């Protein structure tokens, strides 16, 4: 094979696998282009990294093609083949969110597959909001953050962004040291995702984005859900009302509410024997004691209650709110093992203590 033909083959391989030509194997192949060099020595680690990169690139290409086909079916541009009624969806792991599907697993319905276009739009909007010094009235949710991280993980082009944001999961650490090639790759990924000119994206923008995501990941709001029950009617009321009037007015609607989640009878807790994963999970939840979780839940209940009172123009009575915690106080009081448990129970039930003097009739 001539040097020109060999160069064309290497260039064709570069365009398919590594267009920026950043892998370490390319400089080691250049001596083959010289006539006096008929052999080349390759490092084993470099060759293994090259093969792993090729395999990962091929797998991501297959996943992107499948996502494009699934989005085409979800958009109604193709005929969807009805799945048999007896077919059951593939069981999804409870904890391992990023696990790839098994090749032998049954095919899922098209509406359950991931639409990568929607994930990309969510990632672009959120990174634009956290990177640039601009204001936006858009309301972002926790699902947007999850969709952003899933997209960055699945995409080979933006995987460097995921690696950078992954360093903020544990604590507020400094940005890791990067070479000039890694910095250029990261900046190119941000420019490509945001579709912004090169003059507005620099390393300072990346630092702002990383610190913003760090505050987002370590925020207690990301760990506890916030539930607000609102009506479909107007949210403002001119006349001041009371809690009793609201219960009478909304009683029928509250009774008609149905649960939105259910558990199948055959659902089982999956067994996980990955010791490293369990250690990382325990390290993550260890700094958060149970009392702190209850405190955050009570704090969320308080703010949710105040928002509902404000929306309904209802008079706030502190005793109505304290009724929520009376049951917990009684449980804590009777959990203490002492000799006065029976007397306290009688007092709680409205019965006098057996040691007290009884009134004779």
UniProtKB/Swiss-Prot annotation:
Bilayer-crossing regions:
none
- UniProt subunit comment: Forms a complex with proteins E27 and p78/83. The interaction with p78/83 mediates nuclear translocation of P78/83. Interacts with protein Ac102. Interacts with IE0.
Name the domain of life: Viruses
Organism of origin is Autographa californica nuclear polyhedrosis virus
**Keyword Ubl conjugation attributed:** no
The UniProt function text for this chain reads: Plays a role in host nuclear actin polymerization by recruiting p78/73 protein that is capable of activating an actin-related protein 2/3 complex to initiate nuclear actin polymerization.
A Pfam family for this UniProt protein? Answer: AcMNPV_Orf101
Family classification? Belongs to the baculoviridae C42 protein family.
Q: For the motif Nuclear localization signal, what are the positions?
A: 357-360
Q: Where is this chain's protein located in or outside the cell?
A: Host nucleus; Virion
Q: Which InterPro entries match?
A: AcMNPV_C42 (IPR008562)
* Cellular component terms (Gene Ontology): host cell nucleus; virion component
Q: Where is this region: LXCXE motif?
A: 32-36
Which UniProt keyword terms apply here? Host nucleus, Late protein, Virion
Q: What is this protein called?
A: Protein C42
Q: Does the keyword Phosphoprotein apply?
A: no
């Amino acid at each position: 094979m001539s040097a020109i033909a060999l160069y064309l083959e290497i260039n064709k391989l570069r365009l398919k696998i590594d267009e920026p030509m950043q892998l370490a194997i390319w400089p080691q192949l250049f001596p083959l282009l010289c006539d006096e060099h008929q052999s080349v020595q390759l490092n084993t680690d470099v060759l293994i990294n090259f093969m792993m990169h090729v395999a990962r690139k091929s797998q991501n290409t297959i996943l992107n093609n499948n996502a494009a086909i699934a989005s085409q079916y979800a958009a109604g541009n193709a005929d969807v083949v009805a799945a048999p009624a007896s077919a059951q969806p593939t069981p999804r792991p409870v904890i391992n969110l990023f696990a790839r599907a098994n090749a032998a697993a049954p095919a899922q319905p098209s509406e359950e597959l991931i639409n990568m276009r929607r994930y990309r739009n969510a990632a672009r909007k959120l990174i634009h909001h956290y990177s640039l010094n601009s204001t936006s009235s858009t309301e972002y949710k926790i699902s947007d953050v999850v969709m952003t991280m899933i997209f960055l993980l699945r995409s080979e082009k933006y995987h460097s962004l995921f690696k950078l944001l992954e360093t903020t999961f544990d604590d507020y650490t400094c940005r890791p040291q990067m070479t000039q090639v890694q910095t250029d790759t990261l900046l190119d990924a941000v420019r490509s995702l945001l579709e912004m000119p090169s003059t507005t994206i620099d390393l300072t923008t990346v630092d702002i984005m990383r610190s913003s995501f760090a505050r987002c990941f370590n925020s207690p709001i990301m760990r506890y859900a916030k539930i607000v029950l609102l009506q479909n009617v107007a949210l403002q009321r001119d006349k001041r009302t009371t809690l009793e009037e609201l219960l009478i007015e909304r009683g029928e609607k509250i009774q008609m509410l149905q649960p939105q989640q259910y558990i199948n009878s055959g659902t089982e807790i999956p067994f996980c024997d990955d010791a490293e994963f369990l250690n990382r999970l325990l390290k993550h939840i260890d700094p958060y004691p149970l009392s702190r979780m209850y405190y955050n839940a009570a704090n969320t209940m308080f703010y949710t209650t105040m928002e509902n009172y404000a929306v309904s123009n209802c008079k706030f009575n502190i005793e109505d709110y304290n009724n929520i915690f009376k049951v917990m106080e009684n449980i804590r009081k009777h959990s203490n093992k002492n000799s006065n448990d029976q007397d306290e129970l009688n007092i709680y039930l409205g019965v006098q203590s057996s040691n007290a003097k009884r009134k004779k009739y």
